[in-house]
UniProtKB/Swiss-Prot annotation:
Its main location: membrane. It comes from Leptosphaeria maculans (strain JN3 / isolate v23.1.3 / race Av1-4-5-6-7-8). It holds the Pfam family SQS_PSY. The chain crosses the membrane at residues 3-23, 35-55, 65-85, 120-140, 152-172, 173-193, 221-241. GO terms for biological process: carotenoid biosynthetic process. The keyword rRNA-binding does not apply. Residues 250-581 are annotated as: Phytoene synthase. It catalyses: all-trans-lycopene = gamma-carotene; gamma-carotene = all-trans-beta-carotene; 2 (2E,6E,10E)-geranylgeranyl diphosphate = 15-cis-phytoene + 2 diphosphate. Residues 1-243 are annotated as: Lycopene beta-cyclase. It is a multi-pass membrane protein. PANTHER family: BIFUNCTIONAL LYCOPENE CYCLASE/PHYTOENE SYNTHASE. This is Bifunctional lycopene cyclase/phytoene synthase.
Length: 581
């Protein structure tokens, strides 16, 4: 009896598990728990027969003086625990690294395959894995120096072949932060741990079953291969799981109303769905939405990564529509052209929400009247989950913007509130509608109405911050969103702001605007606790990420550079993590 192997866990595997748990805990969702538990179960069940065979046939062994004693099918409990903790650690690292990535954009249709040679890549991968399995089988039959290597290959190879065949698109297409990095980091770490353990004799590979080659002094090549392939298995398993979820949630025509915790059978059916059945238009909508969000709102893109799959999809599509509508109006060459775009958008909403208008009519209108690069944003708007009025109010906010060409439409505080409600409060209301559509809630209709009203107020707060940040930028395009009543109180008017947006008196008004923003924020933030629990954290991140801009502006001596206040990425991440805690 001994504690050497147990001490390996206490020193080297449990501390990373604790640290990764603390790091990821604020982001942990039910689906994450499901994924990790599922993979841990598979890892234990799949490894026990293989490991038991190795021990019984003395391929490797554990001296009595290094283990506590209890075994499961001749496997020391410390080794069984290792199956669990390795899978847990690598899975959590994958979740941390992949969280920012919106993975559905990496799905490809049959048409994409023709351009990307996906089928050829799949076949090459399958051929390599089949070759490795065949060589492993040969090594085992020879019962020589390659026995241990062969046993590793014929055990891991079939699982890798299955996962590759099902999820090769994700394995190849996703960024290295989602694929290579979560394999390399834990593998290098375990190579170091294994080197220390082998030197101390914690476990021993029997002579005659190994090549005797070392990756470096103290690390047998077979052990290096084992840890590499087990981490590849874990990450490929996570990728296959996420591939299934992406298909499940991205294509409602294939899987209407999917469960947030789908059964293994549903996940398998999702993975087996032919890519020829994918909705190419929807994938285009996702890709363009992500591209717009990355360009236009880094704070919201960071916040969007904290939302779960289907809600994140809907929010991205909603943002894409709002962004496209705003750009159509803002980029118009004349006021008359801008009014025409707003009229076309009103017509689009009329067609979408009229029960007697068929879908093809909406599509025809979009193709005839709108630029090509706006089609996906319009046609993929999740209108079936949204009421029409907030969208119409958003367009009314754009109409207020057009009034700047004659005179400022914002004469008073009331005008400023109305404008902010229309261009930002409406977006907050629609976000809440999407949340209540996805997650069940026991709130009464009256309480839901209060939550939506609070969301409207929070939208006003965020718009106030936006206006405070962009005073200089807006002045360059001839717009002053500060109420003329406020300007008169300090001896200014719209013309003086347009000529010199850096006037010290404007800084005082910026401070007043931010004070009002934080008043709206304080009034509305308690209502977040009334939202379904799954959405509370992500909504707080979205709000706090933007309000951090306001806090930056309020700092003594802070100077807005190039017309905008930028919160560094590290600070945005810190705000998100602190908020979720």
């Amino acid at each position: 009896m001994g504690f050497d192997y147990a001490l390996v866990h206490l020193k080297y595997t449990i501390p990373p598990a604790v640290l990764l748990t603390l790091l990821y805990r604020p982001l942990l969702t039910k689906i994450d728990v499901y994924k990790v538990a599922f993979l841990v179960t598979i890892a234990v069940v799949a490894t026990i027969p293989w490991d038991s065979y190795l021990i019984r046939n003395r391929i490797w062994s554990y001296p009595d003086h290094v283990i506590i004693g209890p075994t499961l099918f001749d496997i020391p409990l410390e080794e069984v625990f290792f199956f669990v903790v390795q899978t847990y650690n690598t899975s959590l690292l994958y979740l941390v690294l992949s969280k920012p990535t919106f993975q559905p954009v990496y799905l490809c249709t049959e048409r994409d395959e023709l351009h990307g040679s996906w089928r050829l890549k799949r076949l090459i991968g399958q051929a390599i894995l089949l070759g490795a399995i065949a060589w492993g089988w040969f090594c085992v039959r020879e019962r020589g120096l390659g026995t241990y290597t062969g046993l590793i290959l014929i055990w891991a190879g079939p699982f890798l072949l299955l996962l590759w065949s099902l999820a090769y698109q994700f394995i190849i297409g996703l960024p290295f932060t989602n694929t290579l990095l979560p394999i390399v980091l834990p593998t290098l770490y375990l190579w170091i741990v294994d080197t220390l353990a082998l030197r101390r004799g914690t476990w021993v590979i029997s002579p005659g079953t190994k090549f005797g080659v070392h990756l470096w002094d103290g690390l047998e090549i077979e052990e290096a291969l084992f840890f590499l392939l087990t981490n590849v298995l874990i990450v490929f398993g996570q990728l296959a799981f996420d591939n299934a979820l992406a298909v499940l949630y991205a294509f409602p025509h294939l899987f209407p109303d999917p469960s947030l915790l789908p059964s293994p059978a549903t996940l398998i059916r999702s993975l087996l769905t032919s890519c020829a059945q994918y909705d190419e238009a929807r994938l285009t909508g996702f890709r363009e939405a992500v591209s717009r969000l990355k360009r236009k709102s880094r704070s919201f893109y960071l916040a969007s990564s904290t939302f779960q799959g289907p809600l994140r999809m809907d929010l991205l599509l909603l943002y894409s529509f709002c962004r496209v509508a705003d750009d159509l109006v803002d980029n118009a060459a004349t006021t008359e052209e801008a009014r025409q775009w707003i009229a076309k958008l009103h017509k689009f909403l009329d067609n979408v929400y009229r029960k007697d208008v068929v879908c093809s009519s909406v599509t025809d209108q979009v193709r005839k009247e709108f630029p090509l690069d706006t089609h996906s944003a319009l046609l993929q708007l999740p209108c079936c989950k949204l009421s029409a009025e907030p969208l119409r109010d958003l367009l009314r906010g754009f109409e207020m913007d057009l009034e700047f060409n004659s005179t400022s439409p914002i004469q008073s505080t009331e005008d400023l509130v109305l404008y902010s409600e229309r261009v930002a409060g409406t977006v907050a209301q629609m976000c809440i509608q999407l949340i209540f559509h996805l997650y069940p809630s026991s709130l009464t209709a009256e309480k839901r109405h209060k939550v939506v009203a609070a969301g409207n107020s929070m939208g006003v707060a965020l718009q106030y911050v936006n206006i405070a940040r962009d005073i200089g930028v807006d002045a360059k395009i001839g717009r002053v969103y500060l109420p003329t009543d406020w300007l008169s109180e300090v001896g200014l008017n719209c013309d003086t702001v347009l000529k010199d947006p850096k006037d010290p008196r404007i800084e005082a008004l910026r401070g007043r605007l931010l004070d009002d923003a934080f008043s709206f924020y304080e009034e509305a933030k308690l209502a977040i606790a009334q939202l379904p629990i799954e959405a509370q954290g992500p909504i707080r991140v979205a709000v706090e990420s933007y309000m951090e801009i306001g806090r930056t502006l309020k700092q003594d001596g802070f100077i807005v550079k190039a017309g905008r206040a930028t919160v560094p990425k590290w600070r945005r991440v810190l705000v998100a993590w602190r908020t979720l805690n």
